[in-house]
Swiss-Prot record:
Conjugation of reduced glutathione to a wide number of exogenous and endogenous hydrophobic electrophiles. GO terms for molecular function: glutathione transferase activity. It catalyses: RX + glutathione = an S-substituted glutathione + a halide anion + H(+). The keyword Transferase applies. Residues 15-98 form the GST N-terminal domain. Belongs to the GST superfamily. It comes from Alternaria alternata. PROSITE patterns: GST_NTER. This is Glutathione-S-transferase. The keyword Transferase applies. Gene3D superfamilies: 1.20.1050.130. Keywords: Allergen, Transferase.
């Protein structure tokens, strides 16, 4: 790869991240949590510039998270990019008991449904709502309101799902990591979470677990965004 950093060597699984911002942190935290849960040896590489040619060759979308890992025979380098893909890769490669990825086709399909819904709906909708609300130089009230309205529709779907008997999380255990960043505030701008009590409860429950607290900075030794290049 052109201009590949000399200190980057794929000896074990490498998770690529960027220094945390309001919109970049959560996607990389999710595979990190799953790696920790499964006890997978790994390194974290903090990318200085995602537009660099060497990184574009790894992920043409120029975003994190990205995983690189040697193939079992050591001949090839495997890669996964986008947060949903990295979660599925980790589960396929390391979750031999199906604890997080599902123990059969039915459970795996259920998990993948909710992961894909997040990727296609709530994730990008919330990202662009936040962008137009906070960062876009020109205020566009109709655009902001449309995105906010779409977010409430998607939260309604989550709340109904969690209202089903015995449904503590959206799918099998894996899916709890997709929801770990929800609802740290009851209201933000004109978007309030008071009506989504089950979503809030599930988010708070997950956010208090050690595997979630640690990557979010509760343990400074394992902060997701270290000053060094790798862990």
């Amino acid at each position: 790869m052109s201009d590949k950093p000399s200190e980057l060597a794929v000896q074990k699984l490498v998770l690529f991240a960027v220094k945390g911002t309001a919109t970049s942190t959560h996607n990389t935290v999710r595979p990190l949590i799953l790696l920790d849960e499964l006890g997978v040896p790994h390194e974290i590489y903090v990318v200085d510039r995602v537009s660099a040619p060497w990184f574009t060759e790894i992920n043409p979308h120029r975003m994190v998270p990205v995983i690189l890992e040697k193939s079992p025979d050591g001949r090839d380098t495997l890669r996964a990019w986008e947060s949903t893909s990295t979660l599925m890769y980790i589960a396929d490669a390391y979750d031999k008991d199906g604890t997080f990825g599902g123990r059969n086709v039915q459970e795996s399909s259920d998990i993948n449904n909710w992961l894909t819904l997040h990727t296609a709906a709530l994730g990008p909708t919330a990202k662009y709502w936040l962008y137009f609300y906070k960062l876009h130089p020109e205020k566009l009230p109709k655009t902001i309101e449309k995105l906010r309205s779409n977010i409430t529709v998607q939260y309604d779907i989550l709340e109904r799902r969690l209202n089903e008997p015995g449904q503590q999380y959206l799918a099998w255990l894996n899916e709890k990591f997709k929801r770990s960043s929800y609802n740290r505030r009851h209201c933000y701008a004109s978007l309030c979470y008071e009506k989504y009590r089950r979503v809030v409860r599930a988010g708070v429950k997950v956010a208090q677990t050690a595997r979630v607290v640690c990557p979010y900075g509760g343990d400074t030794r394992r902060g997701v965004w270290p000053a060094r290049k790798s862990t």
